């Protein structure tokens, strides 16, 4: 029987104001929660690992300029190739028509995009376009400009970035003998600090060895010059010796805004950017120079303002020895007056992806909030931030049509994979446009989740979600529990479908996710609450969630496991070391165990100089790193532990897993390592994903899982 998508019950017609009351950013209320007492039994079968290849991954939402059509891409996993088949579809945004699969001469197409006149453009050998209302009509061949860059609104200029000539160094010439032996060398050599980049060959190229680049504008061939403009074919507008990001045009084609890192060649400093502008006559203006990290510059449609986002720069935090990070805000500067204001100074979440309204009166943006992503806006005249979309849900990939009539997004829940939705700009009149997994819903009963709001040990409100085991019946319990911790740590768990979690639930496990302190979407104080002590308060938040779940559901406190990847892997290692009598099994993925060894061997380890107050050779920082390292407490671990790691992980080096594995084996604790060949920090590929899930499930089943035969599992005296 098909499960019902609950999102249709959420009213979206009201725009509410942020900043006060229970709907405020960063505010969680702790109600006296009442949980269901009756649990209807599933009518479909449980999810199986073989179902993995039946789930379609939704990608690349794009709405047409007039808001009438939506194109999206599907990636269908293929077991035989370890790859995907990619499909492009188009659907009417009003929900009046079924989605249409776009093919070109029977073949799949690529790179969908919308033209200004509302045609759907795609690549199939060459570039073509079709009328979305009639995809079967003969496609029209589209010409492709050979000029790369950003055209000005008046069509007269193309703005681009041009590398400056490199100054050749004068090195001593080698003798013939030296040349022969240099040619025989097999290995790597480097003398730059940032020699690692996860997923890149080792060593990564020296980023400071790149040439400076400048902004150049080139006259479009055949372009009509503005009245009275006598100009050369090309102009170099800047001579900063920096490496600017892609410039954006002022609506009157007279100014370009861009960002650039003023310290880009200093390898000891951390990347950040300031905001600049330059006129087509080369007049330069710098808007920021305060140590913050700025981005996303955009001019208002009426040409009066420039907006940009910004947050504390890493060097700024480090040099001031701050005990917290900073906010991320949205700024507005008047081009006439040169005055900058912070539009979100009194708002406690992190705006991203800002977009101007056509009337220049509002800026729309996305932000995480309480396990979801929502659309917000703020008036350019100031005032409170307004929340547009609402509900216990996450609006992913939000797109706004060029005419600002329609928003589109993907939406999924714990028990429902993502589908495409559209709504009016104010969030009202929501339409579901796709139904991608009907066959699965008709056959498989997926487990639903319960939202938990509970106090941590010090009373701090924490949000989490508990996924029920398939066929849950309290009288048949107690059931084992798998606790999943998210990565980051400055990220969040939340609303959305997760195949692995559903697989655990289908095999008789509760699955708990918590947004512990350091998670995003709950305000700055919450986000930075673990500063200098990763694992302490956030670990308590996870443990309090376990206690809360056990108190309210039929969970066996003697059969609890921890799992997670990256920071979630660290958290797993931390929990089993600091709360050894609470866990019987664990599966940390790419988890740090030793902050000292991580410092010099990982590609971003040095950024932790902020949250650990320094480097390993500084006494206070070293003390904190040792204190917060799971390896320090390895002698306490009792949980049978499966270490998952990529062979060439440069974000959390494989040696981190080795250190903890050796410690556990030396202490007689069951442990196993699975290392994925050629894999970096994110272990990719369908074969690897399936293999990993199979082995994690086997490990948990072996040490604490339900056994239909009633026989003892290895956690009661055997080995898996």
Language-model-derived ranges and their functions:
Residues 60-62, 201-215, 245-248, 255-257, ...:
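Non-catalytic accessory segments flanking enzyme active sites
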Residues 62-69, 111-120, 149-157, 247-256, ...:
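Blade-terminus and WD-like Trp-Asp/Gly-His loop motifs, strongest in beta-propeller folds
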Residues 97-119, 124:
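Blade-loop segments of beta-propeller domains
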Residues 506, 513-720:
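Active-site-proximal cap/loop segments of hydrolase catalytic domains
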